[in-house]
């Protein structure tokens, strides 16, 4: 298997190079040149296996021999050994045909740990073989940054620089990024919003002289390995409910489209997913795009679900690539229109292709808070605001097919929003009880590419 860019003009790579590269040289995102199918028997055979074994069986066809079978199994085992639940991704029933998939039992209490903990292991193994040193740069709306720092802190051959929007993440999210004292970790508070941070990271990747000089690597969901790791829990949850003999649907709270795109890949592999429901907050560009066909950016509105406060959903480009028949030139044209004019119109054929698979909904601030309060009172289940967005949207799409809503973060990561809705402040797990007593290390920077690049040059390897 080889990996190709969504814009059609970058080198074709193998899995390891794709993982270490992140963003393609033509500005596109890498995808496998084909999606290997799983047979019904293979999918059924996942039932009853450990999460680690399911991960091995689902991901193995994509890694192109980059790791031996034994090494890959070992790296997966190490990646998930620090999770706080033996099932890794346990499921709870909310209503007769509605289930909640808890993805917040990892080290930083968010779904990003499923991918980031594995990527940390894969990077370490690959770099140990080559003797290379890389500079990991990422943008975060909150959870990606803390998950990346937790996965890479203390590694000898990796420097980590995480850009987050100053004043636009929760206190818990910020402290998870700013309190690790490892010398290879650098938290950068940027004046702007998440889209500002994401644009700066993409600009660094497109500055080839800088990219090569510091050996830049990316761990945002532009990195294919991130998406691949998230495919697994779609399979693990679906087989629990009877797949492949019984179809399921998923509702996914999403801003950057990476998590729901992992569900799309699972469907491409043969998992019987009836519908993938995109749940957005008031920053609803994905909902508007599917509804009208117009992908038109607007100003980011701060919300109680800040990890979804995004207008430029990077991974949507991957879905567009398939919807346009894998026409890289057409996708490149759309992305140029987005950069130059702030939006584009999706062709009717591509829009129909997307609507065959995806549907969408949005939750207002009031609806999000009301969902947190209602579920806590009715079931005792306390949701984070992002998960509440998912539940609210899922409830409008329930049918005879079981619906699985992804619970993306622990409620204690967003205590103010949860307390405002329920009157009770959620507690952090014991291992994080002293988070607010730890010293912070953070550098605040303006929205200036040159200033950020200069800091990275100075600090990497220091």
How should these model regions be labeled?
Residues 1-462:
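PLP-dependent amino-acid enzyme catalytic core
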